[in-house]
């Protein structure tokens, strides 16, 4: 293709993302765009088309960003190439959103007409501003009977500073207003910059492993062009490969002769070593390289950690391989090997939040058919010793001896809660029970309040969001960011079973909650652990001090059932013999902890 034709095509490219709070209708709107532009045949169309995982469809949420090329003819009859990137809405997947925005020039900000601006709406709005993207505000779900368009328009003006006449009214369900959005994309979002004559330069914004093609990278081309047979170089590690295929998603993988400046597509180079490809890396032409790398992405730090152990030891290598493949597809995931006395070999895994943790566990089970035991989630604590050294603790097993600790700091988050004004009291009661510190209350309008709280991250890990939804009848939205580390009265709490510490059940806890949590854990374990032939004590200890003890009663065989009357000394002898046997069993016996016991601990508060 001649350079002049490519330049003309480049002027007709539009790259944009759809961003919104979770459940505001992003994926449904994306479905209507695909349908109206005939990108997907009607016989193939299904709900949440771009959500490729079964898990996404079941939960009704987007977990992974997805890119698709659309051909749109505007009202003048001119043809435009659009690259739509659908993004997640949950706070745990903000990293996915930031990666998608780096490949775009504009965004469609979707706001639910029934719920208005919510916490993640604000986060995504500011994320788009940070990336200097043009924002097209859209009010969705206008077909619902409880839609309040005027109220939402006022919120948009007061909170985001966008004039009401600049918003587009849309129904992702019926398709009303969708063509108007696409016309706005054409007229308002600029075409991508870059020069076809410059050396090839592209950003890897996602990747996944294909069993036949090896590592497939999703790229945005910022200059030059790439085609099959070209030699490419990854600029972070200088690895060189030959391109075996390039193409776009429209919406399925469609090979093309080449990708040129401004396009969003995929690149395969028969890369089998997963470690060689990094999200955020710059790819260039090996023979005619670009001089500098693209900014890429800041490395994101995990905030929640847990241990993951295969139920059978033989699955350890399989679990390791599964985690490597998931990390390729999810750059925010971290893991390292660890060993537990109770559970054997496993991994310490870092996540961006509890939903992220839950999703990864589900994917390991479904996609790789691996059954695994999960330990209680933890965060990174800063432990300062009396000698002045600082120890980072992400696992209770690394907790130092109490005698050498001077102070402990834990991560606090800044949480934004948006809810109807009538629920402020119940939200504050719940938040204070989680050691929350109120910072500010403001009002988006006379009925909607925005509450700012500081929480210890460890406290919101246990059912806070579920309880928040419950006390506000589902109307509250919650979003958070890591704030700072603060001093806290924290202790390591051990669980002993028959006198032995079960290291996988140890947790770090605030001293004010140790006794109550210990009582709950003991009760749960009594329900889960089957009775033995001997009495099994369950103890909760802080250091060497036992603060809670419960016993699992032993099973009892009626050894005197065959004694009919006669001398009582015969019965005493049999009972004494049984007692000695049980004492010996207690000293030698081992109690096997079932998997449901670990799950029960996770469900406690």
From Swiss-Prot:
Query: Does the keyword section mention Nucleotide-binding?
Result: yes
Report the catalytic activity: GTP + H2O = GDP + phosphate + H(+)
State the GO CC annotations. plasma membrane
Stated name of the protein: Elongation factor 4
The record's section on Pfam families has: EFG_C, GTP_EFTU, GTP_EFTU_D2, LepA_C
According to its UniProt record, the EC number is 3.6.5.n1
Sequence similarity: Belongs to the TRAFAC class translation factor GTPase superfamily. Classic translation factor GTPase family. LepA subfamily.
Q: Which InterPro entries match?
A: EF-4 (IPR006297), EFG_III/V (IPR035647), EFG_V-like (IPR000640), EFTu-like_2 (IPR004161), G_TR_CS (IPR031157), LepA_C_sf (IPR038363), LepA_CTD (IPR013842), LepA_IV (IPR035654)
- Topology of the protein relative to the lipid bilayer: Peripheral membrane protein
State the source organism's domain of life: Bacteria
Explain the purpose of this protein: Required for accurate and efficient protein synthesis under certain stress conditions. May act as a fidelity factor of the translation reaction, by catalyzing a one-codon backward translocation of tRNAs on improperly translocated ribosomes. Back-translocation proceeds from a post-translocation (POST) complex to a pre-translocation (PRE) complex, thus giving elongation factor G a second chance to translocate the tRNAs correctly. Binds to ribosomes in a GTP-dependent manner.
Can you say where in the cell this protein is located? Cell membrane
Q: Which PANTHER family match?
A: TRANSLATION FACTOR GUF1 HOMOLOG, CHLOROPLASTIC, TRANSLATION FACTOR GUF1-RELATED
Q: Which UniProt keywords apply?
A: Cell membrane, GTP-binding, Hydrolase, Membrane, Nucleotide-binding, Protein biosynthesis
Query: What processes in GO biological process is this protein linked to?
Result: positive regulation of translation
What molecular function does GO assign, one term? ribosome binding
The entry marks the following residues as binding GTP, namely: 23-28, 140-143
- tr-type G domain spans which residues? 11-193
């Amino acid at each position: 293709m001649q350079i002049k034709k490519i330049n003309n095509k480049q002027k007709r490219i539009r790259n944009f993302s759809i961003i919104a709070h979770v459940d505001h209708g992003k994926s449904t709107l994306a479905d209507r765009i695909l349908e109206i532009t005939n990108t997907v045949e009607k016989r193939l169309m299904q709900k949440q088309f771009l959500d490729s995982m079964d898990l996404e469809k079941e939960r009704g949420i987007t977990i992974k960003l997805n890119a698709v090329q659309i051909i749109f003819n505007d009202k003048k009859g001119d043809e435009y190439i659009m690259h739509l990137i659908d993004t997640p809405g949950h706070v745990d997947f903000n990293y996915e959103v930031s990666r998608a925005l780096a490949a775009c020039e504009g965004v469609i900000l979707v706001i639910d007409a029934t719920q208005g601006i919510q916490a993640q709406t604000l986060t995504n709005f500011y994320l788009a501003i940070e990336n200097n993207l043009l924002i097209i505000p859209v009010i969705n779900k206008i077909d619902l009977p409880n839609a309040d368009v005027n109220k939402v328009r006022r919120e948009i003006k007061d909170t985001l500073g966008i004039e009401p006449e600049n918003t587009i009214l849309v129904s992702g369900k019926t398709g009303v207003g969708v063509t108007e959005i696409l016309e706005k994309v054409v007229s308002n979002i600029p075409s991508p910059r870059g020069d076809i004559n410059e050396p090839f330069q592209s950003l890897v914004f996602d990747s996944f492993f294909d069993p036949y093609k090896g590592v497939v990278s999703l790229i945005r081309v910022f200059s030059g062009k790439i085609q099959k047979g070209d030699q490419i170089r990854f600029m972070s590690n200088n690895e060189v490969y030959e391109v075996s295929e390039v193409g776009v998603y429209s919406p399925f993988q469609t090979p093309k002769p080449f990708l040129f400046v401004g396009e969003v597509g995929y690149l395969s180079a028969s890369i089998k070593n997963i470690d060689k490809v990094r999200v955020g890396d710059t790819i260039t032409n090996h023979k005619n390289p670009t001089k500098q790398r693209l900014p890429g992405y800041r490395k994101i730090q995990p905030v929640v950690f847990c241990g993951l152990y295969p139920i059978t030891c033989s699955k350890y290598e399989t679990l390791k391989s599964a985690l490597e493949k998931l990390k390729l597809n999810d750059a925010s995931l971290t893991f390292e090997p660890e060993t537990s006395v109770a559970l054997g070999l496993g991994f310490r895994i870092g996540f961006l939040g509890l939903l992220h943790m839950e999703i990864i566990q589900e994917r390991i089970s479904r996609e790789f058919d691996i059954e695994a035991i999960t330990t209680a989630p933890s965060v990174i604590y800063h432990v300062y010793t009396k000698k002045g050294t600082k120890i980072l603790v992400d696992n209770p097993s690394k907790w130092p001896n109490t005698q050498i600790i001077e102070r402990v700091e834990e991560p606090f988050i800044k949480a934004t809660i948006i809810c109807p004004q009538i629920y402020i009291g119940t939200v504050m009661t719940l938040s204070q029970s989680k050691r929350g510190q109120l910072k500010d209350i403001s009002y988006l309008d006379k009925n909607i309040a925005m509450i700012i709280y500081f929480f210890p991250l460890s406290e919101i890990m246990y059912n806070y969001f579920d309880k928040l939804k419950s006390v506000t009848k589902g109307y509250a939205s919650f979003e958070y960011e890591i704030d700072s580390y603060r001093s806290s009265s924290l202790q390591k709490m051990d669980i002993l079973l028959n006198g032995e510490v079960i290291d996988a059940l140890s947790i770090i806890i605030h001293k004010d909650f140790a006794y109550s949590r210990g009582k709950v854990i003991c009760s749960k374990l009594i329900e889960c652990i089957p009775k033995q032939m001997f009495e099994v004590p369950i103890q909760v200890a802080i250091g060497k001090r036992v603060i809670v003890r419960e016993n699992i009663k032993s099973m009892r065989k009626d050894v005197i059932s065959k004694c009919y009357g006669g001398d009582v000394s015969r019965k005493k002898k049999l009972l004494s013999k049984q007692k000695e046997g049980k004492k010996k069993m207690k000293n030698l016996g081992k109690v096997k902890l079932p998997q449901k016991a670990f799950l029960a601990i996770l469900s406690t508060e």
